[in-house]
């Protein structure tokens, strides 16, 4: 009884809240065998085809490349891209890519040479002989990203699940209308699907492996059952058709009954999920050494005369594929990449196929119906009932329109899987998913700006802290240099301290200097006075020389005689002043020899006399100059000036020698 209950638990299927049942529209492409698209005249390979940064280029324009040769460097979360065929790189330039914005991205343009020559390949016949890190590196260097639409780097996802994965789920639901790429892949390549699952089991070592597939794919179910015959370690679970049962969180709930918490991934509850197309790409990369250079693309819609699924090389222009399926342009033209609910209208038909391009929908004018204008929300609540993520689409709509970013974030906007179920049931024709996508982009932009501001603030604070540390270090070095003394400096300081100590010890005693023991400065004083007298004599000689030069220009003999007399008087006074200074110095020295007090008095008298002599000399010079000016005017005035000069000179001499 317990075993029967356990078996029933293993086969149990749960359900998720919400969801819709739109028309499937799959038969027009699922019943047609897959075709291989020929090589176009030009391949355009975008450098970024995954969720993450683009890789660094390894090639240049004009270079010949081989099929499978890497065009960019794969490092970290950067997934490399490869040449889909052999040929020449004609350009590396921006080109419009498969994105709703229609912005141009950097692409490698390759002109095929028609030979389709492979690079050297190294197949691994037995992958079990390789360690896990080698397998992960092989998958990463093959450029594999999630082919289900998200484009997450597969190797990074697998590496994060090496420990703690309980359940491995293979997503074969393919729930969106019109898309049948995985359906035809399972019908025609079921063995490769199972081999890829075994590789993942070897890597992850999960406790159970589940394949989830909707019940509207009977041919694919039968093909998988044939490939699984005799294998009990992989369980095929057929689930009811309901959109969006192919979502990661929704399929996890259906197969395990576990709900992924808000803001987290399925790996947080021990579940890892891979798409069927990704599993086949892993098998070809590990065993056959084939990088991801092609994928299955569904071409469908009433605007095509021969819809179906094609093996298309990465970089093939969309218009080229549409022509292979018998494209009949509509008015106005409309081509959608992806399904009718989660896809977007292409801005141009020259955009290339990328790794996440699973469907090209070309509807007829009557197929999509008339576009009705957007109306006001009537708060009917149908969007809430249809939301498979358990969100409040109506509130998120108001927050998005009102730019209330924090409220939108707090209401788990980023848990929205953009399935379009809310917009599908909205009676007001409000494009809710477009509002959510725009709001997510604005929040991401604000987060990036905040992160840049935080980084700038951190750099500024780090710089200020560094400058403060350097300042403290400089001050400390200066203090250490000021405190640190050499041996010689220390000896000098010690000697000065000892002298001060000795002086302080005798500072209270009275100093009595007997007569005759005073410092004898008489010689120094006499020498100084002699130098002053010599300087005055030299000045007098210079003035005499100038006077002589001036007298040579005088034409009148009387003026010459007066000038000569004045010069003689100046010379005589200078000599007398020198003799007086010398006598005073000698007298002072004799007096100092007798008594220090007398020496001081004599020195003071000598200074006074020297000062008077200098004043007399200046007076004589002024008189002489005045006389020379007067001589130039009148001889009588010259005679009077000479007499006055003689009187003043006599008085000055008497003042110097009163005795």
Curated annotation (Swiss-Prot):
One of the Pfam families matching this protein, by short name: Complex1_51K
Primary residence: membrane
Subcellular location as annotated: Cell inner membrane
InterPro entries in the cross-refs: 4Fe4S_Fe-S-bd, 4Fe4S_Fe_S_CS, Ion_transpt_RnfC/RsxC, Nuo51_FMN-bd, Nuo51_FMN-bd_sf, RnfC_N, Soluble_ligand-bd
Enzyme class: translocase
Alphabetical UniProt keywords: 4Fe-4S, Cell inner membrane, Cell membrane, Electron transport, Iron, Iron-sulfur, Membrane, Metal-binding, Repeat, Translocase, Transport
Membrane topology: Peripheral membrane protein
Cofactor(s) this protein requires: [4Fe-4S] cluster
Cellular component, GO annotation: plasma membrane
Ranges of residues in domain 4Fe-4S ferredoxin-type: 366-397, 407-436
Residues that bind [4Fe-4S] cluster 1: 377, 380, 383, 426
Ligand binding ([4Fe-4S] cluster 2): 387, 416, 419, 422
Residue stretches spanning the membrane: none
Biological processes per GO annotation: electron transport chain
Keyword 4Fe-4S: yes
GO MF term (any one): electron transfer activity
E.C. numbers: 7.-.-.-
Cofactor note: Binds 2 [4Fe-4S] clusters per subunit.
Protein purpose: Part of a membrane-bound complex that couples electron transfer with translocation of ions across the membrane.
Family statement drawn from the similarity comment of this UniProt entry: Belongs to the 4Fe4S bacterial-type ferredoxin family. RnfC subfamily.
Assembly with partners or alone: The complex is composed of six subunits: RnfA, RnfB, RnfC, RnfD, RnfE and RnfG.
Name this protein carries in UniProt: Ion-translocating oxidoreductase complex subunit C
Organism of origin: Yersinia pestis bv. Antiqua (strain Angola)
């Amino acid at each position: 009884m317990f075993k029967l209950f356990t078996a029933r638990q293993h086969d149990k299927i749960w359900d998720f809240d919400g969801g819709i049942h739109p028309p499937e529209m799959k038969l027009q492409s699922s019943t047609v065998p897959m075709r291989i698209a020929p090589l176009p005249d030009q391949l355009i390979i975008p450098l970024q085809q995954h969720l993450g940064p683009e890789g660094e280029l390894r090639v240049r324009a004009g270079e010949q490349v081989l099929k499978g040769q890497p065009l960019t460097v794969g490092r970290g979360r950067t997934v490399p891209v490869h040449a889909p065929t052999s040929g020449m790189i004609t350009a590396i330039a921006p080109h419009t890519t498969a994105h709703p914005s229609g912005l141009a991205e950097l692409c490698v343009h390759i002109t095929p040479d028609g030979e389709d020559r492979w690079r050297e390949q190294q197949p691994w016949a037995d992958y079990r002989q390789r360690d896990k890190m080698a397998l992960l590196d092989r998958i990463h260097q093959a450029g594999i990203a999630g082919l289900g639409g998200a484009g997450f780097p597969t190797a990074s996802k697998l590496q994060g699940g090496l420990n703690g994965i309980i359940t491995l789920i293979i997503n074969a639901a393919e729930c969106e209308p019109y898309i049948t790429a995985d359906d035809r892949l399972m019908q025609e390549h079921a063995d490769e699907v199972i081999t890829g699952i075994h590789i993942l089991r070897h890597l992850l070592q999960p406790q159970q492996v589940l394949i989830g597939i909707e019940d509207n794919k009977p041919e694919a179910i039968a093909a998988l059952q044939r490939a699984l015959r005799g294998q009990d370690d992989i369980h095929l679970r057929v689930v009811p058709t309901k959109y969006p049962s192919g979502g990661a969180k929704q399929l996890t709930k259906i197969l395990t009954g576990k709900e992924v918490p808000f803001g987290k991934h399925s790996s947080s509850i021990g579940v890892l999920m891979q798409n069927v197309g990704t599993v086949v790409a892993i098998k070809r990369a590990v065993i056959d050494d084939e990088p991801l250079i092609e994928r299955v693309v569904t071409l469908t819609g009433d605007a095509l005369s021969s819809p179906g699924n094609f093996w298309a090389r990465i970089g093939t222009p969309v218009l080229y594929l549409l022509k292979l399926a018998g494209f009949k342009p509509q008015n106005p033209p409309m081509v959608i990449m992806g399904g009718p609910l989660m896809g977007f209208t292409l801005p141009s038909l020259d955009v290339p196929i990328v790794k996440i391009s699973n469907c090209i929908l070309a509807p007829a004018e009557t197929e999509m119906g008339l576009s009705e204008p957007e109306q006001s929300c009537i708060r009917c609540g149908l969007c809430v009932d249809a939301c498979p993520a358990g969100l409040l689409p109506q509130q998120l709509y108001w927050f998005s329109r009102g730019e209330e970013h924090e409220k939108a974030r707090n209401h788990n906007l980023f848990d929205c899987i953009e399935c379009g179920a809310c917009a599908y049931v909205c009676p007001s024709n409000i494009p809710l998913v477009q509002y959510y996508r725009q709001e997510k982009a604005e929040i991401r932009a604000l987060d990036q700006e905040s992160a840049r501001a935080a980084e700038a603030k951190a750099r500024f604070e780090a710089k200020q802290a560094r400058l403060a540390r350097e300042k403290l270090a400089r001050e400390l070095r200066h203090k250490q240099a000021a405190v640190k003394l050499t041996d010689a400096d220390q000896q000098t300081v010690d000697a000065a301290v000892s002298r001060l100590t000795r002086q302080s010890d005798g500072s209270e005693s009275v100093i009595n200097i007997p007569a005759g023991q005073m410092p004898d400065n008489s010689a120094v004083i006499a020498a100084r006075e002699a130098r002053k007298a010599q300087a005055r004599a030299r000045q007098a000689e210079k003035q005499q020389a100038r006077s002589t030069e001036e007298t040579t220009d005088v034409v009148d003999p009387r003026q010459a005689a007066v000038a000569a007399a004045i010069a003689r008087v100046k010379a005589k006074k200078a000599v007398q002043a020198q003799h007086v200074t010398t006598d005073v110095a000698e007298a002072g020295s004799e007096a100092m020899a007798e008594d220090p007090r007398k020496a001081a008095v004599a020195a003071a008298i000598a200074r006074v006399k020297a000062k008077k002599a200098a004043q007399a000399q200046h007076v004589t010079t002024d008189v002489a100059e005045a006389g020379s000016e007067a001589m130039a005017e009148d001889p009588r005035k010259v005679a009077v000036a000479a007499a006055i000069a003689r009187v003043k000179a006599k008085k000055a001499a008497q003042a110097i020698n009163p005795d």
